[in-house]
């Protein structure tokens, strides 16, 4: 019986989404589930960290993206996102990628925020 309970606890703990290092530093962040970076409709939040960088970001269809909702308005979290750029905002010079680790939540929006 104890072994069964132990196995259930292990299974449950391994299925709980893990916080990223940047998410742990986010302002007033109580919980952030791991983003499904290939389905932008399921982004959990786009809260800014203390450094001004977005917590939600990744690689989608070959380009880096980041959440761009209003961090002071919880209703906007997860609704808006943009493809990012390493240069100035709205440059339309998007950063190409093949995996999430190539992207950075501190990059600016290369184009408009969209839902």
Swiss-Prot record:
Keywords: Allergen, Signal. Residues 1-15 form the signal peptide. It comes from the Eukaryota. This is Allergen Tha p 2. It comes from Thaumetopoea pityocampa (Pine processionary moth).
């Amino acid at each position: 019986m104890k072994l069964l309970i132990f196995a259930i606890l292990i299974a449950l703990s391994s299925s709980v989404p893990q916080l990223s290092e940047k998410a742990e530093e986010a302002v007033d962040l109580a919980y952030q589930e791991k983003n499904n970076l290939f389905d932008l409709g399921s982004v959990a939040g786009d809260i800014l960290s203390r450094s001004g960088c977005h917590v939600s970001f990744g690689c989608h269809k070959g380009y880096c993206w980041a959440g761009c909702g209003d961090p002071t308005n919880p209703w906007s979290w997860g609704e808006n996102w943009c493809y990012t750029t390493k240069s100035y905002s709205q440059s339309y010079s998007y950063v190409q990628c093949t995996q999430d680790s190539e992207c950075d939540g501190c990059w600016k929006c290369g184009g408009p925020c969209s839902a």
